[in-house]
């Protein structure tokens, strides 16, 4: 059997050499391995996933204990930033059995990282990387640390790799020197051979070239050609799908430039500025769904104030669409109507009638910026002292489309889950939330959320292990919010009073100060809630809940990165701290959190969590009105595991926070993406948002 496999593998390896008499050098694709890194079969190369790429890989045939085992691997991978890839992996032999009885002895959840060292040596063909597999946790089934280098040749599509690893895998894979070769004779075919520190392996990989599938999606499959390990019972193979989370929309100056129809529509829109009136501008803004529209002038500058409730992925989109419409309607005639004498315009973006950002620019300069004929260095963003400035404006129109008593009905899936536990690979309680958010007076709103259970696994059913965590059919939240901003110190505050978590009545206050640039933010959250009943459903005395949390956030929009430190008393009464690093892929936020907290008279407990927050609503929602129905702009999916302990017992509630869908950061400050630096970094997105809007207007 082994000899037959060797002959077949050798023939397969030699065949591509005869496909052509000359080799054309091309970039060798970076593909997944059967372990938690990009690479060959069991060994890595020094490449990494591209920034913003999400990949899912299903694999069978893993090195565990003293053999290659018939195990399933479910791997989720991210290109966090240039050079760094992160992996979360579930390894299991069984999906539903209780491991306290029998599930094949393994059900493992782990995290892994690989970092490609920045190329400071000046040789593009040579790369180095460092990595760690199965980081932290209490049971490190596949723990491996490694360093690897690879070299790509110019004369042929070949990449050689060599490295050294320290591994706790009993089979010995990557515990010592390892190396391999990747050969890509065709744009869709790759063949690899490796020495994994114990045996030789070879695989063939088929993949879709870039641009073959829509939205730049790529797919790949890998199958074992040969292995020196005993694989009679289980061959090694994997299948993967990769999706880029970052498009050219937010930062590309060439976005839609090659669309002749769009450019013609843009030219037509910009010609309106010469003859347009103030009433035409107001009508255009109202027709696009903007509310609280008002026009005036201040210091010979035309002023437009409005509120965006339609573009909910990012307030920059609403700002960009509004600026595009204004620049196409605010010509000399319109400026003269409001008493202005220059072609400067300042747009104030409101949130529930409260100003949150202004942008000031020369309108002709901005028109050239939109059509791509020139850059515009005249765009100025301001986030401080906006209310005081608005009070000085000489308004020439009444407020149009106030939006008072209008409501948003926001639908969102909800899930409580347990991942890769002894009770199953994935246990869940699935529900649908419907959140009615009604605008009242300036800064005030009523917020009511209902939870409707839809489905649950057996362990969330009655008498199941997670029974107490299953969703119930209830009004889960009913609150009155009031936002205000303190003058002079420019501290924003929102007070919320009412019902949370179905059974608790009380109040919550959140305060935040932003630096003008937005690089620094300091927040304080205080809350106190009482249970509506003296005893819970199990007959135990209920406890009051309170939080007292201080937060510091550092933002680097040029890196699409934020760091947050939170410390204090959490919802369940435990005291400690959280450290979170967040990376933004356009409007998708991927975060990793380390937390350490303790209850009174207990030891500290450490956890690591990974979360993904993504918009589940269209880029351009339905137009606001008496009732606007939309999806959740920041749906949160997260997984947590214990670290720093010899055991990994299930734990619930430590580090728990009072999460509010309608928190101040989400409703007023663009999910924390705020400050002049952030808006300055996203000027191209302003332009592209308007162009994207125009594509919706083309018949």
Regions found by a protein language model. Give the residues of each.
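Bacterial N-terminal signal peptides that target proteins for export
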Residues: 2-11
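Bacterial N-terminal signal peptides
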Residues: 11-20
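Feature captures outer-membrane beta-barrel proteins of Gram-negative bacteria and organelles
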Residues: 47, 72-83, 106-121, 130, ...
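Transmembrane beta-barrel domains of Gram-negative outer membranes and organellar outer membranes
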Residues: 26-141, 152-156, 166, 204-206, ...
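Short, aliphatic-rich beta-strand segments
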Residues: 54-58, 300-308
């Amino acid at each position: 059997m082994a000899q037959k496999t060797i002959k077949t593998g050798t023939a397969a390896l030699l065949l591509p050499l005869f496909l052509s008499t000359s080799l054309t050098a091309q970039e060798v694709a970076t593909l997944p391995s059967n372990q938690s890194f990009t690479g060959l079969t069991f060994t890595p190369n020094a490449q990494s996933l591209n920034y913003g790429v999400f990949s899912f890989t299903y694999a069978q045939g893993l090195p565990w204990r003293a053999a290659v085992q018939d195990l399933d691997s479910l791997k989720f991978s991210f290109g966090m930033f240039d050079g760094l890839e992160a992996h979360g992996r579930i390894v299991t032999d069984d999906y539903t059995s209780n491991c306290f009885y029998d599930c094949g002895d393994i059900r493992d959840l782990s995290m892994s990282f690989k970092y490609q060292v920045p190329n400071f040596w000046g040789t593009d063909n040579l790369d180095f990387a460092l990595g760690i597999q199965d980081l932290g946790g209490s049971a490190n089934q596949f723990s491996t640390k490694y360093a690897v280098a690879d070299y790509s040749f110019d004369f042929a599509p070949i990449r050689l790799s060599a490295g050294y690893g320290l591994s706790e895998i009993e089979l010995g894979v990557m515990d010592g020197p390892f190396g391999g070769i990747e050969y890509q004779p065709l744009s869709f075919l790759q063949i690899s051979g490796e020495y994994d520190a114990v045996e030789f392996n070879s695989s063939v990989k088929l993949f879709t070239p870039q641009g073959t599938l829509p939205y730049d999606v790529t797919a790949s499959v890998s199958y074992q050609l040969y292995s020196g390990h005993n694989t009679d019972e289980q061959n090694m193979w994997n299948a993967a799908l990769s999706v880029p989370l970052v498009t050219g929309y937010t930062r590309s100056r060439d976005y839609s430039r090659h669309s002749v129809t769009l450019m013609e529509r843009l030219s037509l829109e910009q010609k309106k500025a010469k003859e347009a009136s103030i009433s035409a501008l107001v009508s255009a803004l109202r027709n696009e769904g903007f509310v609280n529209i008002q026009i005036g002038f201040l210091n010979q500058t035309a002023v437009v104030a409005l509120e965006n409730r339609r573009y909910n992925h990012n307030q920059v989109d609403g700002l960009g669409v509004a600026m595009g419409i204004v620049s196409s309607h605010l010509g000399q005639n319109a400026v003269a109507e409001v008493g202005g004498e220059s072609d400067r315009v300042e747009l104030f973006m409101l949130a529930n009638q409260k100003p949150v950002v202004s942008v000031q620019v020369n309108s002709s300069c901005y028109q050239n910026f939109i059509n791509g004929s020139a850059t515009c260095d005249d765009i100025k963003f301001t986030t401080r002292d906006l209310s005081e400035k608005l009070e000085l404006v000489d308004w020439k129109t009444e407020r149009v489309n106030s939006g008072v008593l209008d409501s948003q009905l926001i639908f969102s899936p909800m899930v409580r889950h347990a991942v890769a536990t002894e009770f199953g690979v994935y246990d869940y309680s699935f529900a649908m939330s419907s959140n009615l958010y009604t605008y009242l007076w300036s800064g005030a709103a009523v917020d009511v959320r209902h939870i409707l259970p839809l489905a649950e696994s057996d362990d969330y059913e009655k008498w199941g292990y997670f029974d107490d965590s299953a969703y119930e059919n209830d009004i889960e939240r009913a609150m009155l919010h009031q936002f205000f901003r303190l003058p002079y110190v420019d501290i924003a505050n929102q007070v919320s009073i009412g019902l949370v978590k179905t059974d608790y009545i009380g109040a919550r206050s959140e305060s935040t100060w932003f630096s003008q640039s937005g690089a620094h933010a300091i927040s304080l959250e205080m809350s106190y809630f009482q249970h509506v009943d003296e005893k819970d459903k199990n007959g135990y005395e209920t406890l009051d809940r309170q939080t007292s949390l201080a937060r510091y956030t550092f933002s680097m929009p040029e890196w699409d990165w934020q760091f947050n430190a939170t410390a204090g008393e959490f919802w369940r009464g435990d005291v400690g701290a959280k450290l979170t690093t967040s990376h933004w892929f356009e409007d998708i936020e991927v975060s990793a959190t380390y937390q350490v907290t303790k209850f009174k008279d207990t030891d500290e407990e450490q956890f690591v969590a990974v979360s993904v927050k993504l918009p589940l609503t269209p880029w351009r929602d339905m137009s606001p009105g008496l009732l606007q129905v939309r999806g959740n702009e920041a749906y949160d999916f997260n997984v947590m595991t214990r670290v720093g302990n010899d055991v990994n017992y299930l734990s619930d509630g430590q580090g728990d926070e009072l999460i509010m869908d309608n928190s101040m950061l989400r409703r007023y400050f663009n999910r924390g993406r705020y400050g002049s630096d952030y808006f300055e970094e996203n000027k191209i997105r302003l332009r592209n948002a308007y162009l994207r809007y125009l594509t919706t207007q083309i018949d």
